[in-house]
Amino acid sequence: MPCTTILVGKNASYDGSTMIARNDDSASGHFTPKKFVVVHPEEQPRKYKSVISHVEIDLPDDPMGYTSVPNAVDGEGLWAASGVNEANVGMTATETITSNPRVLGADPLVTYQPAKDGKEEAAGGIGEEDIVSIVLPYIHSAREGVIRLGSILEKYGTYEMNGIAFQDQNEIWWLETIGGHHWMARKVPDEAYVVMPNQLGIDKFDLEKALRDQEKYRCPCEEYADLEYMCSADLKEFISKNHLDLSMDGVLNPRDAFGSHDDSDHVYNTPRAWYMLRNLNPKTKIWDGVNAEFTPYSDDLPWCMIPEKKITVEDVKYVLSSHYQGTSYDPYASYGEKEQRGAFRSIGVNRTDFLSLIQMRLGMEKDCNILEWVAFASNAFNVLVPFYATIDTTPDYFSSTTREVTTDSFYWVSRMIGAMADASYKSSIFHIERYQERVMSKGHQLIGKYDALLEKESDAAKRMSLRHQANQEIADMVKKEASDTLNKVLYELSNQMKNAYSRSDA
């Protein structure tokens, strides 16, 4: 999917959490209703079949339950997208990335071939539709996630290029697919953050270390903390055989070897990375002007950086909502060169289906340390809502999305607020800003309230009940605030109707 991702290492976050967040965006002209649910072990298939590629995969018989943000309308597969499992491992998938003809010629994508001219159909590989569902219920650490997905890629292949994040309380790993069957993964440095548009991103990779460490891939973090890179066992031979290393000094740059630097990247991808880095490291580099070290068109923007200050949930939400505020590229701007407005693809685009931010907090019991923050529709106009992730069910307002447009669904209310506020931007934006601040503030307040209650309760059943109670109270608060904001932006837009007339009845 055309998404945007940010990953925050535990020493780069404001409270020692690992954080992974991704905008899940539909293709241009499409909008995909989503819902936030829990998948129980008995609901997980034992034989998985992909709708898109028809690939069939036998799954282990001992799945864990997990949260999920699947498609709400049947017909195109699950697209579970993001979630946390019972082992407190988080995952978001996928960030569609790019490649180049050299890679795709050497290891072609595995695409579905329908039956034709007397030949039987040939199943394709795995893709975004499948990845969370066939990986997350079976892994007990971020490293295990990399290993399981890597082995599936090698066996079944993939029909698309993807980036996937895995997270536990100690580490975040980022895996990128290479061609149809190859892959590499890099640990996010604890003190750094990573930004990812729809482009292969890893720019440094110690291939020799990755290959030396193969026997230690399965070691827990506590046993081998120095694991930084993982990859396909034959990646070195694959690179050499196909002359993929373009470096002059012999130091592999994966972005040059496996990625793209197309004209389309310079309006669709690199500007997004530039804006996020510029926002979180405004003084570290020169981002603007004739002396800029990096511009929206730069192909060498860093994959990761150490932030100038600790990164908060609010920071993540802001950059993932951005439409280039403060620059001449802002489509809503009334300043700067008019021709530049909307020149680049916004991060907070109109066709965002949802945003998920998984926050794994330190120093807390494992049944309440993980918060899954969820937002629906365009981030420029929506709100990010926290929920305890170790749960058996989710509130109806977030889980009952259907094809029908209704104010009983937070997904549809968020879509309506976004469309109306966009069309009445100047008069509605202050309603949106107040809505966002109120929900974020009250969300923090309610989580703090229930954290304190949970700290005093030791009974497991009562603790589960408290988490459900917290999530429902948060959902009720959000429903009230969203309804109020919908009313306000509807009023503002109604006043701008073309058939308005300033004179009233005598």
Enumerate the predicted regions with their spans.
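Glycine-rich, aromatic-lined ligand/substrate-binding cores of catalytic
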Residues: 227-363
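A contiguous strand-loop segment
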Residues: 2-128, 148-291
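Short, charged, surface-exposed loops that flank catalytic or proteolytic processing sites
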Residues: 138-144
